[in-house]
Amino acid sequence: LQRTNRIKHALSLYRYHEEGKSQFDKSGVRPPSEVDLEVFHRWVKESVALHRQSKAFWKEAVDMLGRDALARVKYEDFIDEAGKVETMERLAGFLDINGLSYAASVFKKATPDSLEAAVVNFDELADRYRGTKFAKFLTE
């Protein structure tokens, strides 16, 4: 399972490690974060490093097992219930499992999917990454 949006992944890492907030919580959405931009940038770099490691692992797995033996699942596939159901159906087909049922989770996503809603100082964050390779992640 991998997240494609580096900024949102970094925010998840930041909230967990710097604020002690879990991504999912039974109590639901938590207040937005005011991020320290320097600390946040360290988590952006960590997200990039983790992404590189994941890509290297995926390449080795494909080389070893072949592409047909693997199914890639992205975090973004699980954002909403429709995506979860579709992904579970795809995985059931991949695994050749009939009658797989899916029950909605009791956990609610703790961080809003919109960066503007999740970060108090979003404008500062956007200014920091505008014009960089991360700019595209600000609006996804």
Set out the residue ranges of the language-model regions.
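PAPS-dependent sulfotransferase catalytic domain
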Residues: 1-60, 64-70, 78-101
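C-terminal accessory extensions appended to soluble enzyme cores
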Residues: 104-140
